[in-house]
Amino acid sequence: MEAKGENDARAPLLAERRRNSVGSMRGEFVSRLPKKVLDAVDPERPSHVDFSRSKGLREGEKEYYEKQFATLRSFEEVDSIEESNVMSEEDDIAEQKQSEFAMKISNYANMILLALKIYATIKSGSIAIAASTLDSLLDLMAGGILWFTHLSMKSINVYKYPIGKLRVQPVGIIIFAAVMATLGFQVFVQAVEKLIVNETPDKLTPVQLTWLYSIMIFATVVKLALWLYCRTSGNKIVRAYAKDHYFDVVTNVVGLAAAVLGDMFYWWIDPVGAIALAVYTITNWSGTVWENAVSLVGESAPPEMLQKLTYLAIRHHPQIKRVDTVRAYTFGVLYFVEVDIELPEELPLKEAHAIGESLQIKIEELPEVERAFVHLDFECDHKPEHNILSKLPSSQP
């Protein structure tokens, strides 16, 4: 009995188990849901829920079930890859054209708005408007950085950069964000100096106010339109533009309000508004620097992504006895994936290679994945094949 129990424990988990599709798993999952959750399930799209139609659920319960349905949707994405292994090149080309168009109109808009804001700053003498103008100047500089980043990613020398230049993207965004945070610090210093000097500036004339309103409102409307357009892009560089456009909307509104209120009521409202913008700039873009820096140091993918990869590997081929290891970690914008699978010891090398290669291709078709490495083995009891700790500095004195 003990020997049998040991054999059962060591038996491959997938050897005699039916590889259930996401449809069967979803059906079983939905059949066990309580009534208050079933009310939220969309009958036309069973993997989607709308908890606004359900009552009696606590926030924790909603979060739990939303994660479960999100997992089912990710499994559906895997099944759709299994049904069609052909990537749509037309969609990729269309998205690339849309991204380049968004970058170009953003840069052209930044040039025009910079000229207008320089005029508004000269006319008004407001430090808050000056902060917004400096922001537009750096927008133009940073836009050049992002455009150069995009072009450098397109021109690839496979001998010099054998895995491409996708890591240029987060590096470019880090430089962009660092420049923006530096701007915030400079504006902060100037605003504090103006408060310390404590000199009341001259009042704005009606003509100056008219120009100020016209230019700043026009700039805000343009930036709002660009934000709405760029935020829909799947390109991370374009989304960086979108974030900057949204930031400009905030700085334009706050800058205009501070300048006008400072002129109408108390002069110190203007530098205080500039300080608020500076703190917002530093906080916002420092977070962007951190986010992109983390993506370059190999942070692990979230559990939902690992579940998705495991589901794909389990269902890939009936000869796969076990999925030993699934790793996914950032190395730039996308994930690098490592999967260890166990195949029968007697399986011919030609067939084993075909299974591993097709699994690698399938994983790399996921939009979140840049490269995949599939390791084949005939057992899963060996020690880890890579000793990362041996490369790390010793904690011993």
UniProtKB/Swiss-Prot annotation:
GO molecular function terms attached to this record: manganese ion transmembrane transporter activity
Ranges of biased composition (kind: Basic and acidic residues): 1-19
Coiled-coil region list: none
Keyword Membrane annotated: yes
Subcellular location: Vacuole membrane
Gene Ontology cellular component terms for the protein in this record: membrane; vacuolar membrane
Cytoplasmic side: 1-104, 148-170, 230-248, 292-397
Keyword Nucleotide-binding attached: no
Membrane topology, from the record: Multi-pass membrane protein
Transmembrane regions listed in the UniProt entry: 105-122, 127-147, 171-191, 209-229, 249-269, 271-291
Protein family per UniProt: Belongs to the cation diffusion facilitator (CDF) transporter (TC 2.A.4) family. SLC30A subfamily.
Annotated NCBIfam families: CDF
Record protein name field: Metal tolerance protein 4
Organism of provenance: Oryza sativa subsp. japonica
Gene label: MTP4
